Amino acid sequence: MSVCLGVTKTIAVSSLGLYAGLLTTTTLVTASAPIDLLLPRTNENPIVNYFKSIVCSVGKISTVLSGLSTIFFGASYFGSPLSLRHPYLIYGMVIAPISAAYLYGASLFAHRHPSADQEKNNSPSPALDDSTVDLGKDFKHPKITPGEAGKCPFGSKTSIEASSESSRKNCNASIVAHLSVVTVFTILGFVQSVVGLYGEGHFV
């Protein structure tokens, strides 16, 4: 094995290993961090914004590492003699593209097929013209009839918050599940690349 091929293969395997490590860290953080830190919201405090900037930076670094591993695995495979074009180079080359395609497909499917909680939350509210409550010129709160004391015509705030909390938990579980699949797949690809490189150095 020439020095040039040895360098390209080392860079490829190292990049894939760092990529797998970042995916593992991201999965663990996502599983333990509150979903509110991961979803876009308004009026966020500086700590939340700082956390999201870190997540964004990690995503950019992961993209660079995955691109490096794909490029250098491809260069190592197609730049090697036919006798040295081992399958682990092809496997390592397709790890990042398959991972990206899986995450993109999962995200696309989730947006096109919302869950029951999301459909319930996104259901249209009754038109204002159909309301039996006269809001008046200076609206502060709808009128409450004596028979409905203690009830708010806007609905139960607790039930709305519970539904929203359920949606956030489902979203977090879905993100963690998809990240776990990609992480395991990437780690397996990294392990087989290390084994392939180790065996190649000893038996070729």
UniProtKB/Swiss-Prot annotation:
Keywords attached to this entry: Autophagy, Membrane, Mitochondrion, Transmembrane, Transmembrane helix
Q: How does it sit in the membrane?
A: Multi-pass membrane protein
- Which residue ranges traverse the bilayer? 11-31, 64-84, 89-109, 175-195
What is the annotated localization of this protein? Mitochondrion membrane
Q: Which branch of life, at top level? A: Eukaryota
- What GO cellular-component annotations does this UniProt entry give? mitochondrial outer membrane
Supply the InterPro entries for this chain: ATG33 (IPR051668)
Tell me one GO biological process term: autophagy of mitochondrion
Q: What does this protein do?
A: Involved in the selective degradation of mitochondria via autophagy during starvation and at post-log phase.
Can you tell me which family this protein belongs to?
Belongs to the ATG33 family.
Among PANTHER family, the record links this protein to:
AUTOPHAGY-RELATED PROTEIN 33-RELATED (PTHR37278:SF1)
Question: Which protein, by its recorded name, is this?
Answer: Autophagy-related protein 33
